[in-house]
């Protein structure tokens, strides 16, 4: 029987999925994750020593009534650590559950200056984009007097001290550069 043919009421259950060339073989790869994320599939973790029985929705009526009497499995809870899960699925699941917020760095003198000047530049030039604002603020910073720049350096020292009190064990750890292709 062709697995793509329409089934009639007395049709036997197709066991095409036991064939190594079965069309759903592709779901054993990363494509499965996309199907799960888009709601076109689901992930079930099968513990070692168990074999899942997959029955297409079009054939599930064969299990109703007095036909094939399969024992109804009872749900069992497992933690992810107890299951053999493909790495690409486990990695994406752990991202959601273990996402920790990074401690913000204390602002330096230029950041404080830029924050203040950014708003005033946007008020005076509403059509200006962020790239142009950055260039203008950088130019303005280089042309500022030592007194003005010292004021911002003192402000940054104050923020650094506040940051030290809030996060006593903080140590700046820059992110590693990813390899460019």
From Swiss-Prot:
Keywords: Cytoplasm, Cytoskeleton, DNA-binding, Nucleus, Stress response, Transcription, Transcription regulation. Induction: By nitrogen starvation. GO terms for biological process: cell differentiation; induction of conjugation with cellular fusion; mating type determination; positive regulation of induction of conjugation with cellular fusion; positive regulation of meiotic cell cycle; positive regulation of transcription by RNA polymerase II. Transmembrane segments: none annotated. GO terms for cellular component: chromatin; cytoplasm; nucleus; RNA polymerase II transcription regulator complex; spindle pole body. Its main location: nucleus. SMART domains: HMG (SM00398). It holds the Pfam family HMG_box. InterPro entries: HMG_box_dom (IPR009071), HMG_box_dom_sf (IPR036910), SRY-related_HMG-box_TF-like (IPR050140). Gene3D superfamilies: High mobility group box domain (1.10.30.10). It is found in: Nucleus; Cytoplasm, Cytoskeleton, Microtubule organizing center, Spindle pole body. Residues 103-171 bind DNA. GO terms for molecular function: DNA-binding transcription activator activity, RNA polymerase II-specific; RNA polymerase II cis-regulatory region sequence-specific DNA binding; RNA polymerase II cis-regulatory region sequence-specific DNA binding, bending; sequence-specific DNA binding, bending; transcription coactivator activity. There are three genetic loci for mating type genes in S.pombe, mat1, mat2-P and mat3-M. Cell type is determined by the alternate allele present in mat1, either P (plus) in a h+ or M (minus) in a h- cell. Mat2-P and mat3-M serve as donor of information that is transposed to mat1 during a switch of mating type. Mating type proteins are sequence specific DNA-binding proteins that act as master switches in yeast differentiation by controlling gene expression in a cell type-specific fashion. Positive regulator of MFM genes. The HMG box recognizes the DNA sequence 5'-AACAAAG-3'. Required for conjugation and efficient meiosis. This is Mating-type M-specific polypeptide Mc. It comes from Schizosaccharomyces pombe (strain 972 / ATCC 24843) (Fission yeast). The lineage of its organism: Eukaryota, Fungi, Dikarya, Ascomycota, Taphrinomycotina.
């Amino acid at each position: 029987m062709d697995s793509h043919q329409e089934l009639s009421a007395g049709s036997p259950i197709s066991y095409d999925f036991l064939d190594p060339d079965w069309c759903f073989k592709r779901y054993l790869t990363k494509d499965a994750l996309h199907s799960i994320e888009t709601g076109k599939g689901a992930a079930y973790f099968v513990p070692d020593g168990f074999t899942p029985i997959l029955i297409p929705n079009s054939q599930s009526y064969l299990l109703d009534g007095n036909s094939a009497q399969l024992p109804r499995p009872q749900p069992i809870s497992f933690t992810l650590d107890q299951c053999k899960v493909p790495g690409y699925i486990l990695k994406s699941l752990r991202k959601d559950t273990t996402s920790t917020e990074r401690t913000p760095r204390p602002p330096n003198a230029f950041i404080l200056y830029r924050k203040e000047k950014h708003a005033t530049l946007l008020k005076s030039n509403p059509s200006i984009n962020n790239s142009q604002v950055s260039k203008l603020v950088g130019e303005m910073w280089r042309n500022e007097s030592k007194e003005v720049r010292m004021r911002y350096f003192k402000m940054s020292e104050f923020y650094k001290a506040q940051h030290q009190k809030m996060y006593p064990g903080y140590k700046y750890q820059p992110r590693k550069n990813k390899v460019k292709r």
